[in-house]
């Protein structure tokens, strides 16, 4: 066993109190500096590794993607890059325009290309929609994905925050009460993340159909389906043409494990797509993202993806079971995604304590959710990784004191 492997083995057995207090303090100070620069988002694992070399970061649980899907895309991209003429052409030439890429997606999902806008990741799409088409009053359920309130144009739009109901084991949306609130407060725009981030709660398909019908008076229903591939139901794109006010947002980062190439799309009305294309979004995708979108119509690639997804889904199910009773000081809420919202039950501890313990003592990076609207310093989020990593995560959580 190498010295590095021995260090990793020892790291799996430690408490923060076992480490040099000055070293722990130094690491915490460095982390706070880089966190400050990242705003409401956690610093990426690569940044943590670069800026805090004292940390031996082995497992990134802030990362919310399917690790097996990443391998499938990487394999094909490596093969493509070996063709030097192809690679040179991709680098030298302008990429395909937005409308051309939309045709790849249209063919793959059975929606007209005129209703598809390609984004440089879902976050760009969220920003574009909020700033160009959302005016008046917007309702955002909490907890939520922070760009939905960060990118609202505060000069033209007023945000109404509405908490999800929390019971013993889950968060959920009470549609009846939500409807009354919207009618009383003249809400004309609403955000729905399904399954929700960061807690993984789900509005089932029949309830979602009922929701769309009852909220058809809205100017805009922004439905974020970033995690829908992990849920026990299909996308609402099958009923898209039944409603004039719905926009469905899809990130490719989470389900295909390709955050680095920035690929996402939305399904929306032709007017919105035309407006975006006429106002600066012709070439907003890079060559690798375009290569990926082309693979959505590659039967072999999609077959391999399905196998990777099925494998990952089994590991998510097993991981959730192991989380349930791993530590009496920790509580995890029911999820229909690959993410799990946890709560610290010890009154003397908070999620930041757990985050530092996992990072410094075990090299496992989790998300402290104390800065998320609708949550407090007791909450954290953790994602499912590969089975061998999940075992290490569970063991570290069991040892937490």
Positions of predicted regions on the chain:
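PLP-dependent aminotransferase-like
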Residues: 17, 27, 124, 131-192
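Conserved PLP-binding catalytic core of the aspartate aminotransferase-like
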Residues: 313, 326-361, 384
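Short loop-beta-helix segment that forms the pyridoxal 5′-phosphate
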Residues: 94-95, 106-128
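N-terminal "arm"/small-domain region of PLP-dependent enzymes with the aminotransferase-like
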Residues: 2-93, 107, 173, 185-186
């Amino acid at each position: 066993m190498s010295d590095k492997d021995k260090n990793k083995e020892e790291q799996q057995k430690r408490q923060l109190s076992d480490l040099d207090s000055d070293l722990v303090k130094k690491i915490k100070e460095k982390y706070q500096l880089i966190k400050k620069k990242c705003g409401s988002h956690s610093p990426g694992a690569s940044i943590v590794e670069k800026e805090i070399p004292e940390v031996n970061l082995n497992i990134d649980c802030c990362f919310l993607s399917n690790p097996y899907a990443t391998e499938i895309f990487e394999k094909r991209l490596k093969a493509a890059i070996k063709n030097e003429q192809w690679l040179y052409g991709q680098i030298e030439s302008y990429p395909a325009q937005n409308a051309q890429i939309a045709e790849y997606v249209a063919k793959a999902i059975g929606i007209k290309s005129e209703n598809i806008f390609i984004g440089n990741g879902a976050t760009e799409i969220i920003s574009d929609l909020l700033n160009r088409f959302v005016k008046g009053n917007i309702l955002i359920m909490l907890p939520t994905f922070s760009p939905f309130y960060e990118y609202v144009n505060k000069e033209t739009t007023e945000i109404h925050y509405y908490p999800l109901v929390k019971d013993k084991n889950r968060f959920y949306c009470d549609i009846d009460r939500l409807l009354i609130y919207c009618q009383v407060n003249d809400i004309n725009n609403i955000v729905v993340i399904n399954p929700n981030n960061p807690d993984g709660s789900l509005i089932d398909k029949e309830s979602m159909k009922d929701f769309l019908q009852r909220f058809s008076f809205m100017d805009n229903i922004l439905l974020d389906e970033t995690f829908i591939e992990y849920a026990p139901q299909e996308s609402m794109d099958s009923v898209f043409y039944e409603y004039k006010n719905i926009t469905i947002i899809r990130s490719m980062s989470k389900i295909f494990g390709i955050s680095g190439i920035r690929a996402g799309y939305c399904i929306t009305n032709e007017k919105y797509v035309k407006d975006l294309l006429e106002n600066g979004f012709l070439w907003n995708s890079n060559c690798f993202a375009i290569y990926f979108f082309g693979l959505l119509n590659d039967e072999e690639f999609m077959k391999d993806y399905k196998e990777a997804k099925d494998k990952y889904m089994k590991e998510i199910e097993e991981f959730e079971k192991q989380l349930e009773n791993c530590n009496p000081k920790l509580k995890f809420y029911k999820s229909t995604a690959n993410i799990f919202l946890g709560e610290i039950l010890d009154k003397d501890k908070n999620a930041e304590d757990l985050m530092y313990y996992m990072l410094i003592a075990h090299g496992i990076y989790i998300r402290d959710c104390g800065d998320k609207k609708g949550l407090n310093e007791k909450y954290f989020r953790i994602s499912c990784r590969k089975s061998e990593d999940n075992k290490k995560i569970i063991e570290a959580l069991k040892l937490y004191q």
